[in-house]
Amino acid sequence: MQFIDEAKIFIKGGNGGDGCVSFRREKFVPNGGPDGGNGGRGGDIIFIGDRHLNTLINFKFKQHFLAQNGRAGAGNNRTGKSGQNLVLKVPVGTQILSNNKEHVIFDLTKDGQEFIIIRGGKGGLGNTYFKSSINQKPRKNTVGEIGDSMWVWLHLKLLSDVGLVGLPNAGKSTFLSAITSAKPKIADYPFTTLTPNLGVVYINNNSFVVADIPGLIAGAHLGQGLGDKFLKHIERCRIIVHLLDITAENLLQNYYTIRDELSSYSLSLKDKTEILCFTKTDTQSNEVIMSKLLELQPVINRVIYPISSYTKYGIKKLLANILSELQKS
């Protein structure tokens, strides 16, 4: 299924039904009083978070969503039927933004969470309502209210515990497939991953969700490559796992490229707990691995975990550390 994480839609509550002008007409009661009923309410627009959804594709090809109108009132003081509410299911993690994108109206972060964004219009009043001691036969009624309407943006930010970051071809998708049952596309060329992938890690009777986003390049926060579109998906992550390809020529520069992009995009990303690891260590000798660890660790003042997604070397230790950090946060 195509991954869509942004959509602009028009939503409108149902109109209220009109009130009715009616008078009793029964045998032997030639001058019956008013009996016009009120109109029914218009339907509401309701958003619901659904954990079984992971894309906004349902809003790509249909842009207008209208709740049902209320029915008009009827004689014998019958109130019109209310319009049905329109329920719009969206993935958990969906934000509803104003038309100018400057205001977050609501953030659906839980499965089953509901938000009534628009109320339907009230039903109009029938002529029974206007009967008084000085007006026994009112011919007055009111029309139903027009339902509110607005344009809104839907932004999906995936909910995960761990976000994987790194340059293109750093081994993120291979790592995800090694630790979860996720099956992302894997190939030996940059930008194999074009959409975020999610997987669940099970360890020591615990579990956590890992998100793999497309590789970042310098200038990602300005729209270079694919990064600026997908960086938002790791904003909600509790910790970041930064993968460095040990076969790359300039490891220090590669490290700072990613750190600079995270910092430039959001201060919240800059300050998140980061776990750093070397990938593809099965391609290097122990001497080379140790040399690169000694070269880089003192400079960045970080522990680096050497791993191989192919042989599973170092994976168990890394996952245990990730779980420990999650339990602290």
Curated annotation (Swiss-Prot):
Question: What protein am I looking at?
Answer: GTPase Obg
Q: What does this protein do?
A: An essential GTPase which binds GTP, GDP and possibly (p)ppGpp with moderate affinity, with high nucleotide exchange rates and a fairly low GTP hydrolysis rate. Plays a role in control of the cell cycle, stress response, ribosome biogenesis and in those bacteria that undergo differentiation, in morphogenesis control.
Q: List the disulfide bonds.
A: none
The EC number on file is: 3.6.5.-
Query: Which keywords has UniProt assigned to this entry?
Result: Cytoplasm, GTP-binding, Hydrolase, Magnesium, Metal-binding, Nucleotide-binding
Its annotated compartments are:
Cytoplasm
Residue sites binding Mg(2+) per the record: S173, T193
GO BP, one example?
ribosome biogenesis
One CC-aspect GO term: cytoplasm
Domain Obg: start-end pairs: 1-159
* Annotated GO MF terms: GTP binding; GTPase activity; magnesium ion binding
Q: Which residues form the OBG-type G domain?
A: 160-327
Q: What positions does the entry give for GTP binding?
A: 166-173, 191-195, 212-215, 279-282, 308-310
Which cofactors does the annotated protein need, by name?
A: Mg(2+)
User: What is the native source organism of this protein?
Assistant: Orientia tsutsugamushi (strain Ikeda)
Q: Which PROSITE patterns match?
A: G_OBG, OBG
Per the record, the major location class is: cytoplasm
Which InterPro entries does the entry link to? G_OBG, GTP-bd, GTP-bd_Obg/CgtA, GTP1_OBG_dom, GTP1_OBG_dom_sf, OBG_GTPase, P-loop_NTPase
Q: What HAMAP family does the record tag this protein with? A: GTPase_Obg
Q: What is the gene called? A: obg
User: Subunit structure, per the record?
Assistant: Monomer.
Q: Which family does the UniProt entry place this protein in?
A: Belongs to the TRAFAC class OBG-HflX-like GTPase superfamily. OBG GTPase family.
